[in-house]
Amino acid sequence: MTDTYKMVEIVGTSSESYEMAIKNGLARASQTIKAISWFEVIQQRGAVKDGKVSEFQVILKVGFKLAE
């Protein structure tokens, strides 16, 4: 038997760090996507307010196994 996976893109955010943005994105995605198998960071970026970093953002590709 072979397995089939699906990929979706999500954006995780945090006011603290890129690492927390990844964790926040995966935590939220896991509420609706079961059996997340892997992730890939596609892009890192941030928002600036009043000359200071106000938000860290990461675009993630998330892969999960399709139910049988």
Regions found by a protein language model. Name each.
Residues 11, 42, 63:
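Residues in well-ordered beta-strands of folded domains
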Residues 2-38:
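Short, well-ordered alpha-helical segments
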